[in-house]
Design a protein with these regions (language model features):
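P-loop NTPase motor core
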Residues: 2-120
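Active-site-adjacent bridging/hinge elements
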Residues: 34-43, 134-140, 167-177
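Glycine- and acidic
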Residues: 47-53, 142-151, 177-190
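Charge-rich, solvent-exposed alpha-helical interaction surfaces
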Residues: 66, 86, 103, 125, ...
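Long, low-complexity, polar/charged, intrinsically disordered or flexibly structured peripheral segments
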Residues: 108-159
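Conserved Walker B catalytic segment
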Residues: 153-195
Length: 195
């Protein structure tokens, strides 16, 4: 993951840990590593069992739900409540996410990213801020808040479209790589979880 993202550690990029000391002797392998490091990439590294919901494995969409959660978290959106992440994504697309966060903190005296996990207790502030920003009417914001606590379903196709849209906005041959640990144990013998 460090190499794909070409992360910097102690002032040195990941690829330099391999090139500076001449650790890689095969020029083809080294060229492939440099190519991978030069491609702008978001790497999402996670243990699926620790990110999955305790009751979520019964659903045939359990795996895509976990991928959505970590994808949302990688962007700084709410991972635990996909409806909130959808709102944050829409606000971000419209250039209003920072404004929303500032106004929410003014209205509630709590930073949005801390308060969003207690969404059930903050709905009035969310409605007020969304309507004051003229992002939604009061009625639409209340309706959205009611739906935001309902079960969330996403298809694999819809998730793939979200990732594709994200990549296209990043441009310049940007990649997103999901590196999943413990997937075999997570699926086990459950045929519903197999793709």
């Amino acid at each position: 993951s460090y190499l794909l993202a070409n992360k910097e550690v102690d002032g040195k990029t990941a690829i330099r840990y391999f090139t500076d000391d001449g650790k890689i002797k095969d020029n083809v392998v080294l060229a492939d590593m440099k190519l991978a490091a030069d491609i702008p990439t978001d790497v999402v590294l996670f243990n699926i069992d620790s990110k999955g919901e305790m009751t979520g494995k019964q659903s045939k969409d359990a795996i895509v739900s976990v991928f959505l959660k970590v994808f949302n978290e990688m962007q700084g959106f709410c991972g635990s409540m996909p409806f909130l992440a959808d709102l944050e994504r829409k606000l971000s697309e419209e250039g209003l996410y920072d404004t929303f966060q500032s106004r929410f903190e003014e209205a509630s005296s709590s930073p949005w990213k801390e308060a969003r996990n207690e969404f059930d207790f903050n709905q009035d502030d969310v409605v007020k801020v969304l309507s004051d920003m003229e992002f939604m009417s009061v009625e639409a914001a209340r309706n959205w808040c009611e739906k935001a606590t309902e079960p969330y379903a996403i298809s694999i196709e819809r998730f793939a479209q979200l990732v594709k849209t994200y990549i296209e906005k990043k441009g310049k041959n940007h990649h997103v790589v999901f590196l999943v640990d413990e997937i075999g144990q997570y699926i086990g013998d459950d045929s519903k979880l197999m793709l």
